[in-house]
């Protein structure tokens, strides 16, 4: 329980830091709109690296998914052999319930490609005999 509290608190702290920075950039009165957009893009890219893409940040997200989604990523890693770590990262984002456009941004992919990958993964799981098949199907149906 204490571990859940620590991870959840850290997640909210990071989220509010992100929101606060974006609001600050957007509300600057004496800056041209094009400069604001460049600043916001730069800041979101930095935040992506700091909070979502780095290994430490990702391990924290995976722990949260395991805590709140019935140990889904641990089961998935044991049961399913994927090509590389980025595939597991994408699955974790799916299991966490991230919107498709957010996953595309995080993975530097086109939105259509993320939809296709999720569809192929759903078909693969549907035709499998994994012990936690129902859990995976539920998490991918969001």
Regions found by a protein language model. Name each.
Residues 11-25:
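Long alpha-helical scaffolds in very large eukaryotic tether/adaptor proteins
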Residues 21-57:
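Histidine phosphotransfer helical core of two-component systems
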Residues 45-47, 51-142:
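Cytosolic nucleotide-binding catalytic cores of signal-transduction proteins
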């Amino acid at each position: 329980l204490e571990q859940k509290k620590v991870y959840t608190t850290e997640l909210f702290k990071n989220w509010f830091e992100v929101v606060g920075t974006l609001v600050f950039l957007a509300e600057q009165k004496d800056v041209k709109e094009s400069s604001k957009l460049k600043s916001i893009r730069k800041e979101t890219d930095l935040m992506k690296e700091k909070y979502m893409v780095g290994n430490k940040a990702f391990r924290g997200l995976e722990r949260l998914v395991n805590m709140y989604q019935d140990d889904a990523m641990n089961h998935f890693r044991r049961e399913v052999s994927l090509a590389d770590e980025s595939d597991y990262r994408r699955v974790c984002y799916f299991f966490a319930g991230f919107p498709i456009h957010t996953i595309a941004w995080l993975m530097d992919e086109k939105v259509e490609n993320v939809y296709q990958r999720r569809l192929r993964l759903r078909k693969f799981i549907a035709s499998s005999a994994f012990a936690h098949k129902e859990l995976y199907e539920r998490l991918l149906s969001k």
